[in-house]
Amino acid sequence: MNDVSQRTPPAWSAVFSMTLGVFGLVTAEFLPVSLLTPMAADLAITEGMAGQAVTATAAVALVTSLLITAATRRIDRRYVLLAFSGLLVISNLLVAYAPNMPSLLLGRVLLGVALGGFWTMSAATVMRLVPEDSVPRALSMIFSGVSVATIVAAPMGSFFGEIIGWRNVFLIAALFGALAFLVQLATLPRMATNARTRLKTLFEVLQRPMVGLGMLAAAMIFAGHFAFFTYIRPFLETVTRVDVNGMSSILLGFGLANFLGTFLGGFMLERNMRLTQIVMPATMGILGLGLAGVGGVPLLDAMMIALWGMTFGTVPVAWSTWLTRTVPDEAESAGGLLVAAIQFAIASGAAVGGLIFDAGGAIGVFMVSGSVLLLAALLILFGIKAQTAAAT
């Protein structure tokens, strides 16, 4: 049972402020993807070097997720979360005014700290803001910020970059960060911390029954998804054979469906968490194998990809909810482990997917991706049954 929310009204305004923070963080994370060419030209570096701005953020986020709970164990979580939003603003300003590559990387490193830290503490913070039965709904609200940012960051960054320049785009991102900071300042309550948490707590949490298997299953799902997502464009080009407009429409459909999926996830998890955890990767696995087997019909492919997007939208909400119910006493440490597992899965899924793509093309990637997702569903069904049942 969550100790604060049982005695006080749900702090939905604070949850909304965290959603704004998520939107700002994820938007800033992916802006360089659509601005690589002008950034590289302006800083007199290659596009490959500019791309390291994304890599640096992900790497620092992974390390931060493992260390931040112990490093800030004596600090009120209100101030820690405000610090992350402050780092978001500073990061975007450093990038906007960066005269060279080191300055750019410094800004992106600060963003990685904010990103990894925020995700580590998000589930534990939600537990303090709303009653236990409202946690899935609150998490779905927060993850909707991810979906919106994913939809708008790249196209809007590219669009405004052409009109006002890439530096001004990052200045706008800094304004969004400042807005999130101000709303959080007005709405986040004081939240005491667990001063007993140490770095070794990570290992203690990992040794609890079924936690390790849960992290493995989550990593498999994210690896399978990002192997698919990384190579979706080559699939649409070579198998579905759509033009640029068709591709944009399909990807927009994926993003919109993903946004709806975050709210669907909250609805389903409030009714049956374990069933949701099993059905979603199983559905994604079937869709991956279906695209590999019968892909090539634009309308059918678009429908399956949209359904994949909606299904995946429930996944982050599901695993964050699982975390709050399985390790409620050390939700921050468990959150750090989950973030690290997901970041590693994203990197490994894309990397292994590249090897498979070179050998068997996009169809090969989708076949392996679908198989991994089905294995993850089986692992949850047979390996995590007792713990999840107890948690629900």
Locate predicted features.
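Paired small-residue
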Residues: 91, 102-110, 299-307
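A late C-terminal transmembrane helix in Major Facilitator Superfamily
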Residues: 326-362, 369
